[in-house]
């Protein structure tokens, strides 16, 4: 599979999910029961979000979480996970020193699960999970942003990031790359691949004077630098 091909990556993701569903049906003996659990976790809150902005929950693997941390570790400032699901990335970020760490998730069941995980880890008072539509979250004070979103919403996310993020911020996108931004570095293969993007110095991303913005590559010890260094602005 081509490393940066979102179509092939999405196909692989669907194949993985199908295999998991088949195993679930075989073990439970009832597709209805599986569907009930699935709907309970994924549907609350979606009715208030336009269809094109809905992002289904698929938890990050341990390898994906580690790749995210490898690209953010040691960076100062606020870290946020947009669509934080069960909170595993936020909790891991706090543990490796990325503080404050905040997760935004619309599904109330997943927010509750994330808070339970934080409580069990002894971090209930240290990490923050907020039930909020990620499209309504202000990113103007964020220095580090992680996202694991569907390819269909990434063009809209680019607009939000470009408009709101301050200079020097870093965006880490898992599973699928941002469609028009040029990454400074990447780590992992296939669905475990994670890309890093830096907002240039000299103003917010939406305030660039030219149509292409130079950025600084800062690969981590386990990451692979990517040639180039330009973020394409929307016309």
Swiss-Prot record:
UniProt EC number:
2.1.1.-
Q: Which GO terms describe its molecular function?
A: protein-lysine N-methyltransferase activity
Its Gene Ontology cellular component terms are: mitochondrial membrane; mitochondrion
Q: Where in the cell is it found?
A: Mitochondrion membrane
The domain of life is: Eukaryota
Q: Which reaction does it catalyse?
A: L-lysyl-[protein] + 3 S-adenosyl-L-methionine = N(6),N(6),N(6)-trimethyl-L-lysyl-[protein] + 3 S-adenosyl-L-homocysteine + 3 H(+)
So which residues are the signal peptide here? none
Membrane topology reported for the UniProt record: Single-pass membrane protein
Domain remark text: The pre-methyltransferase (preMT) region is responsible for mitochondrial localization.
Similarity-based family:
Belongs to the ANT/ATPSC lysine N-methyltransferase family.
Please describe what this protein does: Mitochondrial protein-lysine N-methyltransferase that trimethylates adenine nucleotide translocases ANT2/SLC25A5 and ANT3/SLC25A6, thereby regulating mitochondrial respiration. Probably also trimethylates ANT1/SLC25A4.
Q: What is this protein called?
A: Adenine nucleotide translocase lysine N-methyltransferase
- This chain's source organism reads Homo sapiens
């Amino acid at each position: 599979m081509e490393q940066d091909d979102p179509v092939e990556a999405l196909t692989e993701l669907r194949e993985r999910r199908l295999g998991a569903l088949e195993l679930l049906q075989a073990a439970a003996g009832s597709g209805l029961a599986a569907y009930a659990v699935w709907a309970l976790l994924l549907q609350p809150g979606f009715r208030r979000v336009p269809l094109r902005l809905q992002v289904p929950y698929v938890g990050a693997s341990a390898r994906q979480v580690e790749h995210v941390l490898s690209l953010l570790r040691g960076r100062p400032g606020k870290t946020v996970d947009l669509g934080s699901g069960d909170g595993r990335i936020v909790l891991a970020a706090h543990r490796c020193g990325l503080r404050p760490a905040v997760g935004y998730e619309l599904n109330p069941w997943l927010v509750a699960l994330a808070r339970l995980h934080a409580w069990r880890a002894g971090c209930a008072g240290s990490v923050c999970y907020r039930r909020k539509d990620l499209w309504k979250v202000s990113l103007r004070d964020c220095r580090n942003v992680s996202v694991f979103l569907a390819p269909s919403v990434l063009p809209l996310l680019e607009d939000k990031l470009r408009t709101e993020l301050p200079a020097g911020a870093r965006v880490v996108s898992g599973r699928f790359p941002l469609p028009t931004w040029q990454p400074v570095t990447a780590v992992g293969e296939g669905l475990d691949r994670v890309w890093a993007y830096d907002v240039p110095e000299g103003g917010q991303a939406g305030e660039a004077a030219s149509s292409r913005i130079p950025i600084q590559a800062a690969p981590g010890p386990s990451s692979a630098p990517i040639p180039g260094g330009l973020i394409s602005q929307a016309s």
